From Swiss-Prot:
Subunit and interaction comment: The antenna complex consists of divinyl chlorophylls (a and b) and divinyl chlorophyll a/b binding proteins and binds more divinyl chlorophyll b than does the antenna complex from high-light-adapted Prochlorococcus.
Transmembrane segments: 27-47, 93-113, 140-160, 201-221, 248-268, 315-335
Family per record: Belongs to the PsbB/PsbC family. IsiA/Pcb subfamily.
Lineage: Bacteria, Bacillati, Cyanobacteriota, Cyanophyceae, Synechococcales
SUPFAM superfamilies: Photosystem II antenna protein-like
Task of the protein: The antenna complex functions as a light receptor, it captures and delivers excitation energy to photosystems II and I. The Prochlorales pcb genes are not related to higher plant LHCs.
Recorded superkingdom: Bacteria
Annotated membrane topology: Multi-pass membrane protein
Protein name: Divinyl chlorophyll a/b light-harvesting protein PcbD
């Protein structure tokens, strides 16, 4: 993390990232523990929503964000094709069990295992040490992340092809084969918000699966080849030396998640193919006052949650504002990674009483 030239810098308790910055074992512990928290939140919230679900009120008018996501991918339907929540409790309980497994793994890595995996006796584990200004180390780790995301995309494509997902045009679950038309995928970069074909949606995920797995394999191979053996010349400032750091990687992560949240907000607000009206409520209307926001357009006199708003309105607005603040975090950490010292700003403001001004005519 940025020290502004002070090698003995100390951090307050609130600067949690500083605890794991140069301790790869503890870094893994925080990741695994965070995964456990996400699983616990997903499982617990799903059970909470299921216990309060009222079949006489549209799902989108209730507190049903997790149920809506499950319904969209074809989970919770009986043999007659009606959504009854069958199997949902099982999925929620599995998430709760997994949260304990992940929590235990986080504790093991945080308390029992080595602080740094490079000290581990396991040869493969040593490869995941943290060297923030080493492009080989960072690209090797990036490659594994890309492969995991690619596998997740492939699983989703196969789930839609074999099990089927909910098609709002039919009002039923159907099997969806992906459309791997590359010209369509290219054009959908610009009009994806209006996409109305599940085949195109799955085609995009299939393409992402291929691109991410291929890219991940490339990065792993590239990371396993020392920089000096790649015939790329010296690892210089021009090529990123001394810019690649823990703070820089954090800023890029915040930029990615912030951008995805904002894109999801615009998509959720208006698209009824990926976010079916039956599960999320009616499409929203875009407004702008001090900042952008979206409002409901349907009759919500029967709404039971979100202060009288639909699940779509809650999901959209929360995603947008979380994305906005994630991007502010990106700018903050990116500037710090570039060497900008925010302390100079506060020092300048605090010294304004002693400042002298000269006006030249």
């Amino acid at each position: 993390m940025q020290t502004y030239g002070n090698p003995e810098v100390t951090y307050g308790w609130w600067a949690g990232n500083s605890v794991v910055t140069n301790r790869s074992g503890r870094f893994i512990a925080s990741h695994v523990g965070h995964t456990g928290l996400i699983c616990f939140a997903a499982g617990g919230s799903t059970l909470w929503e299921l216990a309060r679900y009222n079949p006489e009120i549209p799902m989108g008018h209730q507190s049903s964000l997790f149920l809506a996501h499950l319904a969209s991918i074809g989970i919770g339907f009986d043999e007659a094709g009606a959504w009854t929540g069958v199997g949902v409790a099982t999925i929620a309980i599995v998430h709760l069990i997994l949260s304990m497994v992940y929590g235990g793994g986080g504790l093991l890595h945080g308390i029992l295992f080595d602080e740094n995996v490079e000290d581990s006796e396991v040869l493969q584990a040593k490869k995941f040490k943290l060297e923030w200004n080493n492009p080989d180390n960072q690209t090797f780790i990036l490659g594994h992340h890309l492969i995991f995301m690619g596998v997740a995309c492939a699983w989703f494509v196969e789930w839609a092809r074999i099990h089927g997902i909910y098609d709002p045009a039919l009002g039923a679950i159907r099997q969806v084969n992906y459309n791997l038309d590359l010209s369509m995928i290219w054009q959908r970069q610009f009009d994806f918000i209006t996409i109305d074909s599940l085949e195109d949606v799955m085609g995009g995920h299939a393409f992402l699966a291929f691109a991410e797995i291929t890219g991940g394999a490339f990065h792993i191979v590239a990371g396993s080849t020392p920089w000096e053996d790649k015939k790329l010349g010296e690892w210089s400032k021009f090529k990123g030396s001394e810019l690649l750091s823990a703070e820089a990687v954090l800023s890029w992560s915040l930029a990615g998640i912030g951008w995805m949240a904002i894109v999801a907000a615009f998509w959720c607000a208006s698209n009824t193919t990926v976010y079916p009206e039956a599960w999320y409520g009616e499409p929203l209307q875009f407004k702008f006052a001090i900042s952008p926001y979206w409002v409901d357009t349907g009759d919500l006199s029967d709404a039971t949650a979100f202060w009288g708003h639909s699940a779509r309105a809650a999901l959209t607005n929360v995603h947008y504002y979380l994305g906005f603040f994630f991007l502010q975090g990106h700018f903050w950490h990116a500037l710090r990674a570039l060497g900008f010292n925010f302390k100079n700003v506060t020092a300048s403001i605090g010294n304004e009483q002693k400042a002298t001004f000269t006006i030249k005519s």
